[in-house]
């Protein structure tokens, strides 16, 4: 099923008993985090806080708190269907030339569908039903959460930041947390390699000293939100991909104060600029690692205009030690990653990002090994093929007889098929998540690869052990008489 906007998604979830309206007053300061955290851990519903303490705007939380709701948001009825989305992205990332006329005709509908999903620009949009400008702008109207006791202040978490570099044809969508530091000021915490930061850097080089236009959409439709966190090929815009997920074109509207285009059905839009050189210390905040991050300096976004729907809904989340909402997103998107990796490395049989590993810091890969050194090639490929795995610190590679999603299996493979010195790959001075305080230098650290595969001649001089396998005939015989044995 496809959802036109966030309200349509809320209605659909409610019909499935996947959303609960909370009428009891709950504060966005710490209390909503506690309620959402308990609900997520219980695999409970999305929550619509209709009476946030001190505010008139409802807060939507725990929206993507189960993999099933992530799948629904991407237009799928089951998590398993996300593999098909991954296959489409794999095809778009590395399209193969047609093998003949028949093959060309078979692929034509895919390209036609992609072309037909180009965003549609509209003149009038519900996200601009109410316009607040100038001195009337006050972010204090929004029920922005303060999530943890040690947080320095309220934090916008689910904003889709829209930017456009001076040398690019299309806009970039990114989700960056934003610390509220005044009635019209937030700190834009984007890392140097992210799209928004790259657009800003190019702008400063081409237009030194000039304000950089930025817009932030809050409460977009689920396909657009999830499109911003999916590994979309550079040749495809997030808006077009959202159209593919939704089954109809993404409607955009030009902002009132700049040329950026934002989702027309979003709940709230923040428009403004970043003045080059205006920086502020951000944090500390509790984050997805389960720790408070260190304070660092980032650009300040000045909000010049707020537009919103009549009676808007504020979409929010929290991040903390897994499981949290980003970890659940990671579990679902894991299914999208598998076909993309298999397109490049057909020998891969499964790929798993354990959510307890902060969603991306550890990966387990199973493969059909074909030659000595093959496992090392695959682990190096994981680190380099998709930028989403740039910060993956540990890659474990095992044979395809191991269940990548079963720690009992994985640990058995590590302890029986590895020699620590021979089968461990260490790489120094690689990009590491800025939030990873365990690295010796901020943003720079090491990576470890573990080859837990059977070793081939050339990798070992010893005879390799044979796995114990039960006799199938005996197993069937005991199955047949098991109840007669009287063993509970």
Curated annotation (Swiss-Prot):
This is 3-octaprenyl-4-hydroxybenzoate carboxy-lyase. The gene is ubiD. The active site is at residue 287. It comes from the Bacteria. GO terms for molecular function: 3-octaprenyl-4-hydroxybenzoate carboxy-lyase activity; metal ion binding. The lineage of its organism: Bacteria, Pseudomonadati, Pseudomonadota, Gammaproteobacteria, Pseudomonadales. SUPFAM superfamilies: FMN-binding split barrel, UbiD C-terminal domain-like. Keywords: Cell membrane, Decarboxylase, Flavoprotein, FMN, Lyase, Manganese, Membrane, Metal-binding, Ubiquinone biosynthesis. Its EC number is 4.1.1.98. HAMAP family: UbiD (MF_01636).
